[in-house]
Amino acid sequence: MPAREPAKIATALATLAGERGDGLIVPPDPATNTHRKQIVDLAANHRLPAIYGLRSATVEGGLMSYGVDISDLFRKAAVYADRILKGEKPGELPVQFPTKFELVINLKAAAALDIAVPPTLLAIADEVIE
């Protein structure tokens, strides 16, 4: 359900909840990041379990996130910026892809949704918010 504006986000989540959707996957893009607090709150209000692509949504109350470690990406970008400032040509630098991903689980959100997170999932999480 693509929705990029606040009113459409609210409508989309209400529709999903009304259709008894089992859950929500929120991709890590600029629109969802801009409106992440609204999405987190609406998902909680509609009792929709959601997995987010950015850690920040889980920190703000979302159930869980799995995605690229943003800090690691910024470190890599800084190295590239340094190389360019030292004279290397940007077009000659190899393309790099994310290599570090993180799983963050919010147990408070899980409890509010009456979800028991399996111990095996907790064991592999990079961060557990209690």
Predicted regions and their residues:
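Short hydrophobic alpha-helices and adjacent helix-cap/hinge residues
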Residues: 1-130
